């Protein structure tokens, strides 16, 4: 019958067509204090600053990383809400700092606040229904990044499962 021939033709053409590539979602521009949602996360950038060392946000607990001469530490502070239904291991996403004409720096230290143990950690698991928690990513960067206010400075967020940026916070 013509109906069967048409369905066979449709099945054959579906099998021979190459799979369509899906475009990565466009990165969300974050503004200080506003929340961006992606995958199973909501993040809110709460602060950005430069410090002399990367240390546990609970001052006096844990060690500190001291940058080399001529470097400083750039810190991005943000709150995270995980909306997933399964536990995931840290790191669940990453960040990089991009300065000027594409100079890129990767995090030296990542901290997140574990509500269950009331402590800042740099490894662990996030369980479903975990309340919102704080995070800090710290980067060693040349002092020029801090001092040269004329060049752009951005923090780009990625999920651990993708190389496409999911969010961008423009510091300047």
Language-model features: locations:
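Conserved functional micro-motifs across diverse proteins
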Residues: 1-172
């Amino acid at each position: 019958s013509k109906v069967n021939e048409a369905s066979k033709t449709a099945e054959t053409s579906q099998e021979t067509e190459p799979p369509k590539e899906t475009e990565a979602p466009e990165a969300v521009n974050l503004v200080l204090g506003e929340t961006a949602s992606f995958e199973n996360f909501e993040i809110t950038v709460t602060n950005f600053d430069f410090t002399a060392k990367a240390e546990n946000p609970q001052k006096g607990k844990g060690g500190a990383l001291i940058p080399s001469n001529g470097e400083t530490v750039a810190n991005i502070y943000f709150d995270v809400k995980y909306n997933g239904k399964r536990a995931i291991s840290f790191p669940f996403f990453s960040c990089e700092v991009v300065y000027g004409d594409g100079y890129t720096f990767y995090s030296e230290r990542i901290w997140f606040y574990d509500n269950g143990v009331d402590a800042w950690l740099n490894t662990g698991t996030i369980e479903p229904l975990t309340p919102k928690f704080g995070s800090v990513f710290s980067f060693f960067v040349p002092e020029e990044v801090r001092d040269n206010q004329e060049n752009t400075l951005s923090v780009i967020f990625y999920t651990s499962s993708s190389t496409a940026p999911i969010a961008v916070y423009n510091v300047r």
